[in-house]
């Protein structure tokens, strides 16, 4: 749906401001490099800790060699314990601005959460930090400084180059929250904590940030303009001190609720105004409705940290901003100069190529393994589809223009030709059209599965009669080569280079000439299936890149194997079937090309509207004598020709009809129901450890 015209000017201002505060490509690359290097180093630390624990457990079990025999089940269990899914370091997750894609220009603080199997301790933190220094040297050439912050239960990592980024790794465990829930329920704890356990409140805050990141990715990332509006409002919170207390999780919740409850997608300007309207309504006031936190089990207000004066100031500022926007002065709210009213004609800017929703790929962090693929050296972090489009554009520029097909060539030589439809035969699901054209007092006819294909075949015949190239020569040469080599090939025998060249020519000619058909206008696979039932096509090879695949299919007919290749399996099967047909059945004829005889007129089904659409001989009893009038009633329940839903079929027996009793019996909707699923939607509550990376599966 197009945005309302009244908000177009607001959209321009919001998007212009967003492009100013959006981080540069160099900043995003630096963030991506630092985060991916840290994740890989933590994966190596986890492997190192598990190996040490495995060695220690092996030394303890060594003095017990009195087991008589080890069965296969015992060996399997040992193998499983070697890669125990409950590792000491269970996974690392991106949280905060990196996970939500809310980074602005100048944001230098990044966050990760490291989940542990047990409650994190000071000794574990020191152990991870010490080994992390060694792992950074093997993972990357960049230099990083590792600092232990025991008071904050985190490890701080700083890079040594511009921009000076700081990555905060917070240690936590789901056991911390489980213990808090048991205590609140009045249960007694049987397990005592280690003496050097880290601060419980810091661990709970890390778990909360993990829930917030998962909720944001599930609810806010899919809303149009939501992420853009949050970035613009984050900049407003930085510029205007009044808005500073709203920054962070409360602002994200407000924007999602205001934009997500709209009945249609909104542009950036309209979405920003809707958020301002929500704040102006008094939602922040002490006697207001408040803001429910969906990531907590118990009902809690996400705005409880705001003081009364702060709530009033933010509400008053939002009302003032809404008045400015209503009078066309949104640029004052955004802190920018007004844009010209007339949009310049030349607006070719590179900004549309930027995916503003996703900053640091991959965006769905929790659906990906913990070990990220390192970024390429040249810094190309664009999506594969854009790379593919670039490659295609380069190929189009470098290659000469494609040759005209036969129809275009004939229209260029003889403009104004009139193509006529002679006949239409075959069943409804696979009709065969016969077209004709008169050129120089000669009439040419050809058939095909569609009028366009039949016209193309007619043009080929005309050009062949005139002695001109048709563009089909490459295809004919390729089929000749397949006729000369139908012999059984051993699997070890490599494919000929000429064969692959001919396959490429076949695929290229197929693109230019339309669908692959036999000389009777049928699909080769379907026609070969009529001759030999139950044939099996096997995939011999698959070569080429993702944008230029080559498939080779093989079929065995009467003990002889035939191969065909194409850009997909369907085309390769068609060429294999075509080679078999032209080799084994060179002189066969089909029913569609039987001698045309003038038959007595048959009363068409359904009146003259459906005349000529059904051949009398396709599996039906045909009688030249028209049925009696009593058998041809057209009303509901009219003898055997009733046409109502659920009535008897079209007249059967020897009266040339279809015995399809039952009509549309049953109606619609009887079998169309959607199964409910536990994962069909997003719950309002998110647990702590669902969906995190497991180091063991990485």
From Swiss-Prot:
DRBM domain residues: 399-468, 520-586
Biased composition (Acidic residues): 61-71
Chain positions covered by the region annotation Disordered: 51-88, 374-403, 473-522
CDD domains with a match to the protein in the record: DSRM_ILF3_rpt1, DSRM_ILF3_rpt2
InterPro entries the record matches: dsRBD_dom, DSRM1_ILF3, DZF_dom, DZF_dom_C, DZF_dom_N, NT_sf
Any Gene Ontology CC annotation: nucleus
PTMs per UniProt: Phosphorylated. Phosphorylation affects nuclear translocation. Methylated by protein arginine N-methyltransferase 1 (prmt1b) in the RGG-rich domain. Methylation decreases DNA-binding and thereby decreases transcription of the gata2 gene, but does not regulate dsRNA binding or subcellular localization.
Keywords: Antiviral defense, Cytoplasm, Developmental protein, DNA-binding, Methylation, Nucleus, Phosphoprotein, Repeat, RNA-binding, Transcription, Transcription regulation
Keyword Signal: no
Residue ranges of domain DZF in the record: 5-379
Motif (Bipartite nuclear localization signal): 372-390
Chief location category: nucleus
Polar residues: bias regions: 490-503
GO MF annotation terms: double-stranded RNA binding; mRNA 3'-UTR AU-rich region binding; mRNA 5'-UTR binding; sequence-specific DNA binding; transcription cis-regulatory region binding
The keyword RNA-binding appears for this protein: yes
Quaternary structure and interacting proteins, as annotated: A component of a ybx2/frgy2-containing mRNA-ribonucleoprotein (mRNP) complex. Also a component of the CCAAT box transcription factor (CBTF) complex.
PANTHER family per the UniProt record, alphabetical: INTERLEUKIN ENHANCER-BINDING FACTOR 3, ZINC FINGER RNA-BINDING PROTEIN
Function: RNA-binding protein that plays an essential role in the biogenesis of circular RNAs (circRNAs) which are produced by back-splicing circularization of pre-mRNAs. Within the nucleus, promotes circRNAs processing by stabilizing the regulatory elements residing in the flanking introns of the circularized exons. Plays thereby a role in the back-splicing of a subset of circRNAs. As a consequence, participates in a wide range of transcriptional and post-transcriptional processes. Binds to poly-U elements and AU-rich elements (AREs) in the 3'-UTR of target mRNAs.
Protein name: Interleukin enhancer-binding factor 3
């Amino acid at each position: 749906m197009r945005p309302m015209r009244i908000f177009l000017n607001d959209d321009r201002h919001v998007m212009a401001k967003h492009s100013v505060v959006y981080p540069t490509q160099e900043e995003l690359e630096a963030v991506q490099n630092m985060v991916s290097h840290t994740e890989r180093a933590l994966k190596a630390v986890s492997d190192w800790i598990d190996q040490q624990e495995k060695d220690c457990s092996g030394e303890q079990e060594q003095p017990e060699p009195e087991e008589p025999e080890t069965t296969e089940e015992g060996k399997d269990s040992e193998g499983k314990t070697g890669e125990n899914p409950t590792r000491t370091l269970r996974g690392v997750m991106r949280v905060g601005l990196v996970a939500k894609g809310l980074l602005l220009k100048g944001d230098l603080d990044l966050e990760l959460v490291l989940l542990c199997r047990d409650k994190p301790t000071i000794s574990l933190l020191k152990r991870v930090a010490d080994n992390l220094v060694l792992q950074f040297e093997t993972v990357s050439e960049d230099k990083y400084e590792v600092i232990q912050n025991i008071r904050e239960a985190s490890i701080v990592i700083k890079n040594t180059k511009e921009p000076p980024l700081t990555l905060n790794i917070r240690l936590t465990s789901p056991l911390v929250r489980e213990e808090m829930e048991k205590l609140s329920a009045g249960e007694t704890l049987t397990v005592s904590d280690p003496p050097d356990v880290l601060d419980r409140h810091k661990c709970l805050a890390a778990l909360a940030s993990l829930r917030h990141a998962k909720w944001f990715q599930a609810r806010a990332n899919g809303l149009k303009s939501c992420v853009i509006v949050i970035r613009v409002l984050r900049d407003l919170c930085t510029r205007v001190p009044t808005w500073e207390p709203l920054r962070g999780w409360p602002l994200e919740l407000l924007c999602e609720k205001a934009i997500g409850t709209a009945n249609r997608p909104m542009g950036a300007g309209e979405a920003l105004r809707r958020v301002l309207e929500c704040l102006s309504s008094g939602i922040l006031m002490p006697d207001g409705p408040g803001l429910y936190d969906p990531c907590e089990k118990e009902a809690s207000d996400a705005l409880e940290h705001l003081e009364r004066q702060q709530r009033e100031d933010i509400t008053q500022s939002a009302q003032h901003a809404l008045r400015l926007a209503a009078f066309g002065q949104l640029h004052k709210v955004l802190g920018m100069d007004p844009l010209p009213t007339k949009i310049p004609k030349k607006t070719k800017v590179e900004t549309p190529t930027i995916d503003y929703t996703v900053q640091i790929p991959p965006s769905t962090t929790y659906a990906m393994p913990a070990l990220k693929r390192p970024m390429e050296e040249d810094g190309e972090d664009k999506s594969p589809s854009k790379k593919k489009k670039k490659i295609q554009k380069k190929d189009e520029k470098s290659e000469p223009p494609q040759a005209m097909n036969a129809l275009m060539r004939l229209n260029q030589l003889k403009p104004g030709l009139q193509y006529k439809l002679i006949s239409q035969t075959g069943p409804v699901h696979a009709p065969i059209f016969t077209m004709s054209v008169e050129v120089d007092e000669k009439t040419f006819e050809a058939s095909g599965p569609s009028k366009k294909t039949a016209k193309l075949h007619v043009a080929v015949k005309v050009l062949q009669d005139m002695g001109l190239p048709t563009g089909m020569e490459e295809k004919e040469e390729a089929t000749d080569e397949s006729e000369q080599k139908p012999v059984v090939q051993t699997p070890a025998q490599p494919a000929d280079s000429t064969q692959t060249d001919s396959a490429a020519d076949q695929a290229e000619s197929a693109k230019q000439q339309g669908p692959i058909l036999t000389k009777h206008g049928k699909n080769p696979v379907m026609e070969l299936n009529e001759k030999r039932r139950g044939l099996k096509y096997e995939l011999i090879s698959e070569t080429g890149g993702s944008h230029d695949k080559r498939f080779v299919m093989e079929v065995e007919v009467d003990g002889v194997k035939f191969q065909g290749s194409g850009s997909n399996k369907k085309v390769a099967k068609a060429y294999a079937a075509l080679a078999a047909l032209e080799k084994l059945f060179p002189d066969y004829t089909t029913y569609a090309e039987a001698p045309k005889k003038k038959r007595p007129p048959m009363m068409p089904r359904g009146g003259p509207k459906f005349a000529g659409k059904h051949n009398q001989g396709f599996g039906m009893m045909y009688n030249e004598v028209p049925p009696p009038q009593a058998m041809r009633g057209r009303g509901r329940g009219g003898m055997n020709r009733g046409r109502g839903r659920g009535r008897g079929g079209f007249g059967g027996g020897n009266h040339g009809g279809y015995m399809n009793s039952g009509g549309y019996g049953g109606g619609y909707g009887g079998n169309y129901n959607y199964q409910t699923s536990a994962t069909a939607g997003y719950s309002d509550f998110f647990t702590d450890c669902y969906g995190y990376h497991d180091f063991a599966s990485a």
